Amino acid sequence: MEDLLVIGSKAKAAASELSHLVQTKKNEGLLACAKALIIHQKEILSANQLDIENAEKNQMKESLIDRLRLTTNRLEQMADGLRQIVSLKDPIGEVLSSEIRPNGLQILKRRVPIGVIGIIYESRPNVTSDAFGLCFKAGNAVVLRGGSDAIHSNLSIAKVLREALKETGINENAVQLLEDTSRETATKLMKLNEYIDVLIPRGGAGLIKSVVANSTIPVIETGTGNCHIYVDESADFKMALDIIDNAKTQRLGVCNACESLVIHENVLGEFLPQVYQRLTEKQVVFRADEKARAICPQMEEATEEDFATEYLDLLISVKVVKGIEEAIAHINHYNTGHSESIITSDYQNAMKFLEEIDAAAVYVNASTRFTDGEVFGLGAEIGISTQKLHARGPMGLEALTSTKYVVFGNGQIRP
């Protein structure tokens, strides 16, 4: 078993060095890592093939194997991701506020690195380079714990990244990957408060719940998305159909996909058959309440669990409401704080929805699929936070920083 105390100590030492690494040197390191991923693609793909073969032996679902699979094109995308991080503005050292107090003290608030970030994730090997790149640009060391399914791929990628950093004259312990993927080691990692400043879980609901329940280190939850679209009585039907189709079917396995429809009862008879036809053509299965099934009896009966479920599949739940108040109450009861949308022509209802829905991103007449760091102008993202502290919504570089007050005086003493 790996000595986590040694790993933590190395990470903390690396973080100290990274905290004052200039932007040009960080960018040099990132470009070296991007180049190395391409140069060493043969060995990375060979390692990935071992993971694919093991997954097939274990009869893993094809959709999950696809998430695990690396190709020449996907490696190029990973390298491009690191190059894009180079182009992002370095947040470290940014002065957020500056004030001269009546006593002559000049007080500045500056952006600084968090320190050491731990990331626990599942089967996507691209997270190894993506997470490293973002943490590194923000001046943080990172300790990675990937899933057992991708262990060969992750080890190969981490080895390449560490060698590239070392050749550039940067502490290779800026990125460390745990070789032991056991739950026991993961649980110990979650209690490494002395060395790790924050943990970020990336994966399904089970992983996130486990980290939140077991960690003694502060956790930023990157969330599951039980996202709703509310079709108000003044909704433009064509707009609603296009938005719902996009939000549900464009990409099933993402946290910003729509999982539940909430429909005003005054448009139920006209709108529900249209959306049913549109989505069933794409093999979507509906699970609906009694009022909706009275209009479309072909729909399956929805349970309480359905309304609380992030399907990530060709399934959608339907709830009929009497108006905006009931819609907001239903959504706030079942949502996961991710992304919620209203389709309406009523300005007052739109504003009420924006004010009263409790979520990281709230939309009027747009698809929930836009909740994404790149779309929001943040560049790459480490994840989408569904909590309110320390970050909320798509987390770019700034979310991987903290602040420090810097005070200049000329001999002041407190009276």
From Swiss-Prot:
Pathway(s) where this gene product acts: Amino-acid biosynthesis; L-proline biosynthesis; L-glutamate 5-semialdehyde from L-glutamate: step 2/2
One term under GO cellular component: cytoplasm
Membrane spanning residue stretches: none
GO MF term (any one): glutamate-5-semialdehyde dehydrogenase activity
Biological processes per GO annotation: L-proline biosynthetic process
Signal peptide positions (record): none
Chief location category: cytoplasm
Localization in the cell: Cytoplasm
EC numbers, comma separated: 1.2.1.41
SUPFAM superfamilies: ALDH-like
Gene3D superfamilies xrefs: Aldehyde Dehydrogenase, Chain A, domain 1, Aldehyde Dehydrogenase, Chain A, domain 2
Catalytic activity as recorded in UniProt: L-glutamate 5-semialdehyde + phosphate + NADP(+) = L-glutamyl 5-phosphate + NADPH + H(+)
Protein keywords: Amino-acid biosynthesis, Cytoplasm, NADP, Oxidoreductase, Proline biosynthesis
InterPro entries recorded: Ald_DH/histidinol_DH (IPR016161), Ald_DH_C (IPR016163), Ald_DH_N (IPR016162), Aldehyde_DH_dom (IPR015590), G-glutamylP_reductase_CS (IPR020593), Glu-5-SA_DH (IPR012134), GPR_dom (IPR000965)
Top-level taxonomic group: Bacteria
Primary enzyme class: oxidoreductase
Role according to the record: Catalyzes the NADPH-dependent reduction of L-glutamate 5-phosphate into L-glutamate 5-semialdehyde and phosphate. The product spontaneously undergoes cyclization to form 1-pyrroline-5-carboxylate.
Family: Belongs to the gamma-glutamyl phosphate reductase family.
NCBIfam families to which the protein is assigned, alphabetical: PRK00197.1 (NF001221), proA (TIGR00407)
Protein name: Gamma-glutamyl phosphate reductase
Organism: Lachnoclostridium phytofermentans (strain ATCC 700394 / DSM 18823 / ISDg) (Clostridium phytofermentans)
